Amino acid sequence: LSASFPAEEKFGLVSQIRRSVVSIVSNIAEGSGRGSVKDFVRFLNMALGSAFEVETQLLLAMRLGYSSANDTTIVDKTNQLQKMIHNLIKKLE
């Protein structure tokens, strides 16, 4: 996806999207290893926030013309991930 972005976005939007995606999985992993449900839920909430960041950044990239309408599948998958994380949080609370 990010390969189609302009070169000047390499350290801007591309970098931010990549950091946000890494943040999602890293927070889930760290939270699951914390040993308490309360901590896990806290890290899941951070992962959820990062998932919303990714969605916003992807939509921005589409509006700026860096990505095509065909990339809506990625946004849809991000929305599915948000729902899964949200449902897990609700189940654990």
Where are these regions (language model features)?
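Amphipathic alpha-helical assembly/interaction segments
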Residues: 1-93
